[in-house]
Amino acid sequence: MANDMIVMVGTVGQGVMRSVDSGETWRRVGIGQGIYSDALVRVLTNHRSQPNTIFAGADRGLLRSDDAGETWQSVTSPLSDYCVWALAIDPVDPNIMFAGTGTP
């Protein structure tokens, strides 16, 4: 397909699944790179001004990818002990992110 899209899905127990062919085929990404093998990924969002930068909220905090979801790193923050259920990038200042949390 000439206009294949990258599609990602956060899963309960399988981390992040990524497709580079508009959903025809899928593979798990990020295992051992901040996402552990049975991660509960609750939310994915991309940075407004940097479309290859993606954030994931999981049961053990916040994760970041700078290459459209191919590789992931844990973000060191006070959120590391919380399940991140929701993420929003400020529409006026894309350097501000809001996170909704709870216990895993």
Q: Which positions does each model-derived feature cover?
A:
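Extracellular glycan-interacting surfaces
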Residues: M1-P104
